[in-house]
Amino acid sequence: MAPRPPSFKTVVVEVDRDAGVGTLRLNRPRKSNAIDPDMWLEIPRALAWLDEDEDVRAVLLCAAGKNFCAGIDVSSPELLSEQLGQATRSGAPSCAGREAEAMYRHVRRLQESFTAVERCRVPVVCAIQGACFGGGVDLAAACDVRVCSKDAVFCVKEIDLAIVADIGTLQRLPKLIGHGRALEMALTARAVDADEAFRVGLATSVLESPSELQRNAFALAKTLAAKSPLAAQGTKAACLHARDHSVNEGLEYVANLNASRLRSADLAEATRARFERRAPAFAKL
């Protein structure tokens, strides 16, 4: 019997085993899916569970309600303080050095929550509707493919809270849309609509409505899930490596990768299926 997805407070996990698609849905719609302390913990846990499920060959990351993600939850001064790692630790010795070390470790933990998207072996498709602000941009930028509805609005909002965006936007967004555009978005906190997001490469397609977005994004994830899981995993890994390394280093990496991939059963199956004019049937990863 297939394992049942775990239950979480702030996200929902579902698996369509026939399609090979796992869905991770942000589920705080009344708060516009603002990121609270529970969500920071649950997103990587949900992704880790999906990554270990052999039936899941692609992940759809989406959100309940009208908005994808409003960024960190700033609904109260106390919650904002906790989110920023400023809560006091009773009984712990304190000095500027220790406080800086604690803040460093706090930020690194938050970064790891969204880097988990990149570390997920399978492709992750992100479906964005409504507001995608602050931490929402951090999360979307970590995904492999982004599609949005016409009402989507992107905003790197941190500077308006006197914060340097530190969860991944300043590292990933320039690689997606270029250094100049990313820096302008981060310095101005200017809202970018869906059409502009498509023009600059932040989104690969724009759908008319949120319902059409969900159908299209799931269909895209299903298409990716039908590919060779070894080839899909390798393609994702090679592209991520190439992003952060030189061309020569990237070529060396993919040569080593394909030294094993070109001897896989998936290559033989894809070749047979092509000559037999049928869809290939790949084994689980």
Where are these regions (language model features)?
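Conserved CoA-thioester-binding segment of acyl-CoA-metabolizing enzymes
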Residues: 1-64, 79-80
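CoA-thioester-processing core
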Residues: 112-121, 127, 133-187, 200, ...
